[in-house]
Amino acid sequence: MKCNIGVIKGDGIGPEIVDEAIKVLDAVAKKYNHEFNYTRILMGGESIDATGEPLTQEAIDTALAQDAVLMGSIGGNTSTSPWYKLEPHLRPEAGLLKLRKSLNLFANLRPAYLYKELVGACPLKEEISKKGFDMMIMRELTGGLYFGDRKTVTENGVTTAYDSLTYSDVEIRRIAKRGFDIAMKRRKKVTSVDKANVLDSSRLWRKIVEEVAKDYPEVEYEHMLVDNCAMQLVRDPAQFDVILTENMFGDILSDEASMVTGSIGMLSSASLNDTKFGLYEPSHGSAPDIAGQDIANPIATILSAAMMLRYSFDLDKEADAIENAVKKILQDNYRTVDIMSEGCTKVGCSKMGDLLAQSI
């Protein structure tokens, strides 16, 4: 199979971790007789340095011409980087928001899985962590508060800021359908998270989710208020399969879920549109403080590449091969510094990539 993959290396540790993901993808291509072609795309700080913009129209057009895009990380040190002296719409992260909108990437998938080899890194009580958990957070990505109208005004010496949260039934229906479709391939349970006791947008969210649920009689579903969900994620994460929610709630809950796994360096992410196209990236940031030191954990990016094979190319067997390689390396007690524990062998970013490529 021939696959055209856009590559955004990005900032900070981005180039290092993407290189290791490509190393593993090349091992997959060799074993399973595929052809993966890579095209570089500039975004974020590296694009600002080269073009003065965090994302150019040329970069968007190049991304649209690919079958999928694999990304490292975007951004720098907000205190010291000159990028953050620019206007907000010219900063690195603005490029990512623009790309998501331009590519209509409305569905964000963030798995949170506790590997049994990493239970010791989980911050939860042992009676909770020993049960393990395996959930998928499905976050609506192009609507809601982050994309609503906003303004700040000063009248009579009082400054007031406004942000608007808007969702249409069309936006809710398409993300709900995607969430239920994902649940059908998992344990067939959806928890729809909202704030319907306060927000009109959440009341519409709940109404549309209930309508969509009727088309999936095999899927168990429930509604949960976002504050309760935040509590349940630390009280009993094993209860969740697919968490379906809007943009801001998903942003917060997915970060919370990532931390109860013990290392955000292990967690992948996919952003999908209504075709097979997707943007795949690690859940963690650019970690500029450790960039260039060969100590970053590339596993989240490598697992993002596995998600790309599964969701954009329907290469389930190949995705399984990457995921099984990660499990094997953990069982063999190889660790990067962020997940290091007593009795294990510490390896750097490039060595971890080598080990995983060899395990394919």
Name each region found by the language model.
Residues 49-162, 248:
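N-terminal glycine-rich phosphate/adenylate-binding segment common to multiple enzyme folds
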Residues 33-57, 231-233:
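N-terminal beta-loop-helix "entrance" segment that forms/cooperates
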Residues 45-48, 233-334:
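Glycine-rich phosphate/nucleotide-binding loop
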Residues 21, 25, 209, 301-312, ...:
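Buried hydrophobic packing segments
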Residues 11-14, 67, 138, 179, ...:
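Buried hydrophobic positions in well-ordered alpha/beta secondary-structure cores of metabolic enzymes
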Residues 6-23, 28-29, 155-227, 239:
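Glycine-rich phosphate/diphosphate-binding loop of Rossmann-like nucleotide-binding domains
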Residues 142-143, 147-186, 190, 196-198, ...:
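Glycine-rich phosphate/pyrophosphate-binding loop and the adjoining helix
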Residues 1-5:
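Extreme N-terminal starter segment of soluble prokaryotic enzymes
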